[in-house]
Every structure is written in structure tokens, then in C-alpha cells.
């Protein structure tokens, strides 16, 4: 048993990197809506007054990429020229090419069971019993803070809030269990006229306290609100944004390993996305069944080959079974070939934009099929 502190961060939908992720997934969604078999690897770069969309896309449908980009930027909240970045007047440049035929030959024109992996890849999935969503507590609560900030901004409850924001939550663990929140860092972009003391009070009383469990807050919990003292200039005016630069925010907040591949902008034949969802699905059902308190799954693939190269389950000594026995159960009951993952998790009919902010895992929306606990009986019978 260990005693330690652990920190995870989240960022808002108005953070530059998250703008890029959401645009990439908005393009993906628009293509899959009309062409479920479209091949998409869409990357986005945002900076002051400019959005550049590039990548490899093969589809039989037409997508007005410029309009998709502008609509998404407005939806996020950059709809005022005074913010320095505005969906109505920023430049939008598109540089799209077709998917390489060398890659396509491994995944196209194959029956569902024989669709090969689009690249060599290793992915990880994780679950633990720290929260009701079976996610690590630090990232779970960091995401909730960002959701609350966006809600108060969009509902005009705190009219001085602006889209860019970040949160960071540190929890103290005893015997591997979270017992108290040690500190909360929250930085939010704001109107230039709001006073710092009013901002700090509002963030603590309207964002932090209604969001975080009272039993985890205590008199010594530290609140660090806009520590630099001013955060007026934000979004792409302050920092460039790129698709795939928040992969730890997107996954488990650093509590679990990461294979390195990002998720957003990729159709489900890209196994760094679809197989990572599958790995989470397996890990969550293992923990949800009560078989283990913590579980991390690794799956690896070779390009053009359907079946995984390797599968490994690590339960950190919290399972009734050995890691070898758990891995054997997984390979017996879960089909991890790309085509079967796509079919079983309904990955051709998703709204991927929903995943592009506030994390890909631990969500309650029915759209997140990899969060279902419909395989727990496999492990409960052990």
C-alpha cells in the first residue's frame, strides 16, 4: 500500500489545442455522416487569425471544410472580434490529400473480419474504482471543473468568463485510495474589467465548491486561481493550437500509460483511436465486475494485420486472478480485430466531436459505447 499525492490537468473547449481537436473531429463527423466508409486523418493548426486544416482524407462525399471550421469556432464561443480570434473573420486554409494507397491496401477491400490495422500501434486502456465513472479521481474532477466553467460562461451566469481555461487537481492518497484534495489550480480567461478579488471569489464559490465533493475538500485545501493575476489574452491569440497535443488530458491524466497516438480527427480504422477505446472498454468491465480495483490493458498491432500482436492485462495486485489468467479471459471473450471493434462498439455511427473536449473516457453519454458495462458477467462468474 502506498501514500502519495497525484496531479492531473484538464483544459477547456476554448483552449487552443482543444479548438484544433474539435475542428478535426467536426470534419470527421461531417464526412462519416455522408460516407461511413470515409478514411480520415485530419490535423488542425490554429493561431492568431488563422486555421489550417490538413491531412489525408479519402471519401466520396463533399464537405465544406471552411464552413465546418467556422461553425465549430462559433459554437465553442469565439464569436466576438474583441477576443482576437473570431470564427467569422479568421482565415481558413485547407490542404488535404488522399490516403496513401500503400496504407489503403491493408484496410480497404477487405471483409469486416480481415480489416488490417492501419499502422503498427500499441494502445492502453485503464479503469479504477476511485470514482463512479471508474476513472482516476484527479482527471475526473479536473474535467468536471472545466465543464462547470463552460456552463457558467455559456449560460451567461458569469458574464465575464471567456473560452480559454485550464484546471489542475492534486489529490492525496493513503493506501492507494484518494482521501483529500490537496490543491486546485484554475486559470480562466476573463473580461479585462473584472477585479481579481471578485474573480477569485466567484471561481471558488461558483465553479470549485459546487463541483468537487465536500468530503474531499478540507480547511487546508489550497486554491490557486489565475495565479499570474491576469488572463485577458487567451485562445489562439496567446498560443498556437494543434490537434493531438493534449493526449494525457484526453485519456487518464497520467495515471496510466499512453501509447502515444492521439484520437481526434481519425476515423475508426485508425487503431490508435478505436483500439484505445476497446482497451478502456475491457478494463472498465473488469473493474466494474469487481474482479479488480485497478486494471490496465495493453493491445499492440502490426500494420495490415487484423489480429493483435499482443494483449496484456495488469491489475496491480488487486485482482482475484493473476495477470496471466486475466489476459487469457480477455483473449477468449473479446474480439480485438479492428473490423470487429468498429462493429461491436458502433464506431461508424458516433458523434466524435463530443469526445474532443472533457476527455474520451469516463463519460455518461450513450454515444460513448466503450463506457458500457455490458460484459461484467464474464468476470463476475469467476
Curated annotation (Swiss-Prot):
Protein name: S-adenosylmethionine synthase
EC number of the protein: 2.5.1.6
Swiss-Prot/TrEMBL keywords: ATP-binding, Cytoplasm, Magnesium, Metal-binding, Nucleotide-binding, One-carbon metabolism, Potassium, Transferase
Protein residues bound to Mg(2+): 17
Assembly, per entry: Homotetramer; dimer of dimers.
Subcellular locations according to the entry: Cytoplasm
Assigned protein family: Belongs to the AdoMet synthase family.
Function in brief: Catalyzes the formation of S-adenosylmethionine (AdoMet) from methionine and ATP. The overall synthetic reaction is composed of two sequential steps, AdoMet formation and the subsequent tripolyphosphate hydrolysis which occurs prior to release of AdoMet from the enzyme.
Positions of ATP binding: 15, 164-166, 230-231, 239, 245-246, 266
Major localization listed first in the record, in broad terms: cytoplasm
Cofactor detail note: Binds 2 divalent ions per subunit. Binds 1 potassium ion per subunit.
SUPFAM superfamilies linked to this entry: S-adenosylmethionine synthetase
Catalytic activities: L-methionine + ATP + H2O = S-adenosyl-L-methionine + phosphate + diphosphate
Stretch list, region Flexible loop: 99-109
UniProt source species: Rickettsia typhi (strain ATCC VR-144 / Wilmington)
Disulfide bonds: none
Domain of life: Bacteria
Amino acid at each position: 500500500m502506498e501514500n502519495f499525492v497525484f496531479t492531473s490537468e484538464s483544459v477547456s473547449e476554448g483552449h487552443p489545442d482543444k479548438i484544433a481537436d474539435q475542428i478535426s473531429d467536426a470534419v470527421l463527423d461531417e464526412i462519416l455522416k455522408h460516407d461511413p466508409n470515409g478514411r480520415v486523418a485530419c490535423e488542425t493548426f490554429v493561431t492568431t487569425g488563422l486555421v489550417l486544416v490538413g491531412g489525408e482524407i479519402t471519401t466520396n462525399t463533399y464537405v465544406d471544410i471552411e464552413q465546418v471550421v467556422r461553425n465549430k469556432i462559433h459554437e465553442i464561443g469565439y464569436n466576438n472580434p474583441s477576443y482576437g480570434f473570431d470564427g467569422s473573420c479568421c482565415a481558413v486554409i485547407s490542404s488535404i490529400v488522399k490516403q496513401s494507397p500503400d496504407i489503403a491496401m491493408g484496410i480497404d477491400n477487405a471483409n469486416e473480419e480481415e480489416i488490417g490495422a492501419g499502422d503498427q500501434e500499441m494502445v492502453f486502456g485503464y479503469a479504477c474504482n476511485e470514482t463512479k465513472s471508474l476513472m482516476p479521481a484527479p482527471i475526473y474532477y479536473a474535467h468536471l471543473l472545466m465543464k462547470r466553467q463552460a456552463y457558467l460562461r455559456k449560460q451567461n451566469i458569469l458574464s465575464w468568463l471567456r473560452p480559454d481555461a485550464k484546471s489542475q487537481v492534486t489529490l492525496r492518497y493513503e493506501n492507494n485510495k484518494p482521501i483529500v484534495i490537496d490543491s486546485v489550480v484554475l486559470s480562466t480567461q476573463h473580461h479585462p474589467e473584472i477585479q481579481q478579488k471578485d474573480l477569485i471569489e466567484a471561481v471558488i464559490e461558483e465553479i470549485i465548491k459546487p463541483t468537487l465533493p465536500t468530503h474531499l475538500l478540507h480547511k487546508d485545501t489550497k486554491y490557486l486561481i489565475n495565479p499570474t493575476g491576469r488572463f485577458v489574452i487567451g485562445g489562439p491569440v496567446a498560443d498556437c493550437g494543434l490537434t493531438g497535443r493534449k493526449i494525457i488530458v484526453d485519456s487518464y491524466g497520467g495515471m496510466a500509460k499512453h501509447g502515444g497516438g492521439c484520437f481526434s480527427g481519425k476515423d475508426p480504422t485508425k487503431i490508435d483511436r478505436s483500439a484505445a477505446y476497446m482497451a478502456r472498454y475491457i478494463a472498465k468491465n473488469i473493474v466494474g465486475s469487481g474482479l479488480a480495483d485497478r486494471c490496465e490493458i495493453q493491445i499492440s498491432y502490426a500494420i495490415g494485420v487484423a489480429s493483435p500482436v499482443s494483449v496484456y492485462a495488469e491489475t496491480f495486485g488487486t485482482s482475484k486472478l493473476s495477470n496471466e489468467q486475466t489476459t487469457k479471459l480477455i483473449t477468449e471473450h473479446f474480439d480485438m480485430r479492428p473490423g470487429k471493434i468498429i462493429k461491436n462498439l458502433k464506431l461508424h455511427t458516433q458523434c466524435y466531436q463530443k469526445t474532443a473536449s472533457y476527455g474520451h473516457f469516463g463519460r455518461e453519454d450513450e454515444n460513448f459505447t466503450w463506457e458500457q458495462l455490458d460484459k461484467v458477467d464474464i468476470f463476475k462468474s469467476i
